[in-house]
Amino acid sequence: MNLQHHFLIAMPALQDPIFRRSVVYICEHNQDGAMGIIVNKPLENLQIEGILEKLKITPESRDSAIRLDKAVMLGGPLAEDRGFILHTPPSRFASSIRISDNTVITTSRDVLETLGTQQQPSDVLVALGYASWDKGQLEQELLDNAWLTAPADLNILFKTPIAERWREAAKLIGIDILTMPGVAGHA
């Protein structure tokens, strides 16, 4: 089982404060473990434009029609000071890894320098931090019913409102997650 380019959808009973009601996009999954980015947990009061200001990135060819007021996600509990940018191709940046035909993850500053310009990728999600599982750990969590899995959907990843991503990701596999046991007040 390879879950690269899949969503992990937290089961309603999962109460860990970081992963509760989370959707994790799996960037890498192999015999050594897995790595992913939480795509529905916005950091409070932090938007892309704030990251660019903090890093003193002010593109000369800024296009004011391109919005930079999108929320930055808490990508996971590890390396929360490190940026991870999920985006659509191209993958012309210094530190890019193609995850699928339609998704790339980049960790280098050069992708940030394109944000707000005509050179930026068409779809972008910026996160600080990531989630990781050791060898066999994710598989055990799946056996323990902590997660549902679904093939990733770019519309949910990049366009669905953040507050709706958990429910919409579960709908990919025909489940209304709000009616499942463990979701109080929605049965």
Curated annotation (Swiss-Prot):
InterPro entries: AlgH-like
Cellular component GO terms, alphabetical: cytosol
PANTHER family (alphabetical): UNCHARACTERIZED PROTEIN YQGE, UPF0301 PROTEIN YQGE
Family: Belongs to the UPF0301 (AlgH) family.
Protein name per the record: UPF0301 protein YqgE
